[in-house]
Amino acid sequence: MQTLAQHLTSQAVNDSLSQLILTLADTSKAISHAVRHGALAGVLGATEQENVQGETQKKLDIITNDMLKDALKADGTVRGLASEEEDHVVEVSTNGQYLVCFDPLDGSSNIDINSLVGTIFSILPASAGELTETSFLQSGRNQLAAGYVLYGPSTMLALTTGQGVQLFTLHPETNEFLLTNAAMSISADTQEFAINMSNQRFWEAPMQTYIADLLLGKIGPREKSFNMRWIAAMVGDVHRVLSRGGIFTYPTDNKDPKKPYKLRLMYEANPMAFLVEQAGGKASTGYETILDIQPTHIHQRVAVILGSANEVDACLSYHGLDYSEEPGLD
């Protein structure tokens, strides 16, 4: 089996980008270690602090954020970083070539119940000149690499550098990420969907109708039965989609009119959309392809519909859109 470093060499990824990806992977090993120690290390539970999103921070949110910041500052290739847990972008090095956006611990509300969590990251090119928030406001099409690390029964890294999606598994003895799936592929059709049904009454009418038709199964207009899955961590739900197909959505809702969207564009939706498209799927807000969005601020939120291409098309048809001719992967 190829190691991560060997794989990057085989794909002719340039040295500086390879170094950065390896730094993120090595840091994820340390995060995996911290997550596995859990209550034994006293890292469970919440703090009294809130992040810029107004969300109460878990202890591990802060710990993992600091681990990634320290590693990226020492790497030498990073110009600046943006994190879910940072109010503003952070300047790292005036000589860095890359910008890194990340969610250090996606699904951290699952920590106290020992369920799935993960790290999501996106790598963008850095431009010359002063580093500001505007430096980061690039469409998802500009991503040079993206991926996530899933901390589950085994620790797995899903990665794309624009050459498909590869899956690596952390070997528990050698502590090396080894290539275990060289070409992840999302089936075009599916009978699984993932959505937070508790928000149903707050969704827009097109999404309410779409889900109602799925629940009708064989007796409804879709003429087939669907199963629902929900992990309450985007990283876990998207991993399932990449592994066996499906559709994952966190749609627009009016539960809080000031916050109609849940997921963050720069460090959740964009990297996941890049992975999904590279695996043959599609990713949309319901009205716009995620990777084509021009960001307006670093913590911008968007609606997300992603997964099996034909099912995403079916969902979009309820929104009055026809994306059937738009390829998910060139």
UniProtKB/Swiss-Prot annotation:
GO BP of this protein: fructose 1,6-bisphosphate metabolic process; fructose 6-phosphate metabolic process; fructose metabolic process; gluconeogenesis; sucrose biosynthetic process
Gene Ontology molecular function: fructose 1,6-bisphosphate 1-phosphatase activity; magnesium ion binding
Keywords: Carbohydrate metabolism, Cytoplasm, Hydrolase, Magnesium, Metal-binding
Main location: cytoplasm
EC number: 3.1.3.11
Class of this enzyme: hydrolase
GO cellular-component term (any): cytosol
Cofactor: Mg(2+)
Cofactor note: Binds 2 magnesium ions per subunit.
Record field: catalytic activity: beta-D-fructose 1,6-bisphosphate + H2O = beta-D-fructose 6-phosphate + phosphate
Binding locations of Mg(2+) 1: E84, D103, L105
Location relative to the cell: Cytoplasm
Residues noted as binding substrate in the record, renumbered to the chain: D106, G107, S108, S109, N196, K262
Top-level taxon of origin: Bacteria
Binding annotation for Mg(2+) 2: D103, D106, E268
Pathway: Carbohydrate biosynthesis; gluconeogenesis
SUPFAM superfamilies: Carbohydrate phosphatase (SSF56655)
Classification via InterPro entries: FBPase_C_dom (IPR044015), FBPase_class-1 (IPR000146), FBPase_N (IPR033391), FBPtase (IPR028343)
Assembly notes: Homotetramer.
Family recorded in the similarity comment: Belongs to the FBPase class 1 family.
HAMAP family: FBPase_class1 (MF_01855)
Protein name in UniProt: Fructose-1,6-bisphosphatase class 1
Species in which this protein is naturally found: Shewanella sp. (strain W3-18-1)
Classification of source organism: Bacteria, Pseudomonadati, Pseudomonadota, Gammaproteobacteria, Alteromonadales
